Amino acid sequence: MERIRPYRKTFLADLETPVTAYLKLAEKAPVSFLLESVERGRQSRFSIVGVGARRTFRLKDGVFTVNGERVETRDPLRALYERVYAPLERHPDLPPFFGGVVGYAAYDLVRYYERLPSLKPDDLGLPDLLFVEPEVVAVFDHLKNLLHLVAPGRDPEEAEARLFWAERRLKGPLPGVPGERAGGRARFQADFSREAYLEAVRRALDYIRAGDIFQVVLSLRLSSPLTVHPFALYRALRSVNPSPYMGYLDLGEVVLVSASPESLLRSDGRRVVTRPIAGTRPRGKDEEEDKRLAEELLRDEKEVAEHVMLLDLSRNDIGRVAAFGTVRVLEPLHVEHYSHVMHLVSTVEGILAEGKTPLDALASVLPMGTVSGAPKIRAMEIIEELEPHRRGPYGGSFGYLAYDGAMDMALTLRTFVVAKGWMHVQAGAGIVADSVPEREYEECWNKARALLKAVEMAEAGL
């Protein structure tokens, strides 16, 4: 098979930002995305903008389609991989992703791989899998202050035409900045009343005492009519809560606006890596308080025990698809600092077994134990019983799969799901044996606060 080549043009990036490039390229585009990253207070080397959809891969109600045409399959992730994978000519100046597909896999995608009860309504009605193959990608190299316009393909004339179009858009004027208000102030309503959530926690504690599970994550969804443009939410969120996985994915029927703190799964095509995060403290006022809080976190038996449980779950998930003897735990139980909090983090890696792909690993890991519980299958059965609706995108993953199998998928947390004129925010609390129901309810609201603050900022005008 002939390799896909990165046809590209390179410019100085001193007159553009990822936001301005996105606004220029995405104007009137049916689908578009912006992926950025801020880790440990610093912007990562690359930001990526993509527009257009050469192909759209969609899964809903057991029907997998490519550009609207049905494809028969029992394994939608394998079907996606087989249609995306192609030999790729890499370039040393470009990041792991400059062509392939970008999108999300919902929490409920697990139903295609595990038998779970179907007790609750799917009120959002969104796809379980939705990925697009962009026509043009703009890569910002913040280290070298360069902007690469890339049109991946095999036909140089066709790729050059796409580059010409994108260059004209970039050199044109900045269009109107999305920020218009739909009117009114957001009024978020929870899908659980306070008492109903407390009762769900009490029932979860009964399951824990009976020995069914060690932990289950019960989430609360907050919903409001949309009052601002989704991109205004993104601009506010990147200011309020800069995170390792910033994402704005306008996929047509749904928009994801994310400031996720957590990687679900990364791969270079052969090696797979997951990084469970469990255990949290706020950042200190200064370096000395930071150090004290980190030491306190490492001494907290409850936090450490919960982390070790989820670390074991991640190790088992990777072990299902890795070659024998290749699963390793790197840097177990170390403290990482983020903009507002610090977390206990471990790294688990393995080498894919013969015949396994990165998307087989995604099927094994999804959903992560940090959003479901342990043991995972029984915890998900209890979630289906106790939560009022299907979760949809929340608790799943979003990110990219490059043509050659390189992949980076984040956990869909701290994310607005915008669809059908509504915006939804969902947050969960891990219920364990000594949980206090009232505190778990407050934890859900506390986790949602950064997103609610972003709504207020966007409504006030940026």
Curated annotation (Swiss-Prot):
<comment type="function">
    <text>Part of a heterotetrameric complex that catalyzes the two-step biosynthesis of anthranilate, an intermediate in the biosynthesis of L-tryptophan. In the first step, the glutamine-binding beta subunit (TrpG) of anthranilate synthase (AS) provides the glutamine amidotransferase activity which generates ammonia as a substrate that, along with chorismate, is used in the second step, catalyzed by the large alpha subunit of AS (TrpE) to produce anthranilate. In the absence of TrpG, TrpE can synthesize anthranilate directly from chorismate and high concentrations of ammonia.</text>
</comment>
<protein>
    <recommendedName>
        <fullName>Anthranilate synthase component 1</fullName>
        <ecNumber>4.1.3.27</ecNumber>
    </recommendedName>
</protein>
<keyword id="KW-0028">Amino-acid biosynthesis</keyword>
<keyword id="KW-0057">Aromatic amino acid biosynthesis</keyword>
<comment type="pathway">
    <text>Amino-acid biosynthesis; L-tryptophan biosynthesis; L-tryptophan from chorismate: step 1/5.</text>
</comment>
<comment type="subunit">
    <text>Heterotetramer consisting of two non-identical subunits: a beta subunit (TrpG) and a large alpha subunit (TrpE).</text>
</comment>
<dbReference type="Pfam" id="PF00425">
    <property type="entry name" value="Chorismate_bind"/>
</dbReference>
<dbReference type="InterPro" id="IPR005256">
    <property type="entry name" value="Anth_synth_I_PabB"/>
</dbReference>
<dbReference type="GO" id="GO:0004049">
    <property type="term" value="F:anthranilate synthase activity"/>
</dbReference>
<feature type="binding site">
    <location>
        <position position="443"/>
    </location>
    <ligand>
        <name>Mg(2+)</name>
    </ligand>
</feature>
<feature type="binding site">
    <location>
        <position position="37"/>
    </location>
    <ligand>
        <name>L-tryptophan</name>
    </ligand>
</feature>
<feature type="binding site">
    <location>
        <position position="394"/>
    </location>
    <ligand>
        <name>chorismate</name>
    </ligand>
</feature>
<feature type="binding site">
    <location>
        <begin position="428"/>
        <end position="430"/>
    </location>
    <ligand>
        <name>chorismate</name>
    </ligand>
</feature>
<dbReference type="InterPro" id="IPR019999">
    <property type="entry name" value="Anth_synth_I-like"/>
</dbReference>
<feature type="binding site">
    <location>
        <begin position="279"/>
        <end position="280"/>
    </location>
    <ligand>
        <name>chorismate</name>
    </ligand>
</feature>
<comment type="similarity">
    <text>Belongs to the anthranilate synthase component I family.</text>
</comment>
<dbReference type="GO" id="GO:0046872">
    <property type="term" value="F:metal ion binding"/>
</dbReference>
<keyword id="KW-0822">Tryptophan biosynthesis</keyword>
<dbReference type="GO" id="GO:0000162">
    <property type="term" value="P:L-tryptophan biosynthetic process"/>
</dbReference>
<dbReference type="InterPro" id="IPR005801">
    <property type="entry name" value="ADC_synthase"/>
</dbReference>
<feature type="binding site">
    <location>
        <position position="430"/>
    </location>
    <ligand>
        <name>chorismate</name>
    </ligand>
</feature>
<dbReference type="InterPro" id="IPR006805">
    <property type="entry name" value="Anth_synth_I_N"/>
</dbReference>
<dbReference type="Pfam" id="PF04715">
    <property type="entry name" value="Anth_synt_I_N"/>
</dbReference>
<feature type="binding site">
    <location>
        <position position="306"/>
    </location>
    <ligand>
        <name>Mg(2+)</name>
    </ligand>
</feature>
<feature type="binding site">
    <location>
        <position position="414"/>
    </location>
    <ligand>
        <name>chorismate</name>
    </ligand>
</feature>
<dbReference type="InterPro" id="IPR015890">
    <property type="entry name" value="Chorismate_C"/>
</dbReference>
<keyword id="KW-0460">Magnesium</keyword>
<keyword id="KW-0479">Metal-binding</keyword>
<keyword id="KW-0456">Lyase</keyword>
<feature type="binding site">
    <location>
        <begin position="244"/>
        <end position="246"/>
    </location>
    <ligand>
        <name>L-tryptophan</name>
    </ligand>
</feature>
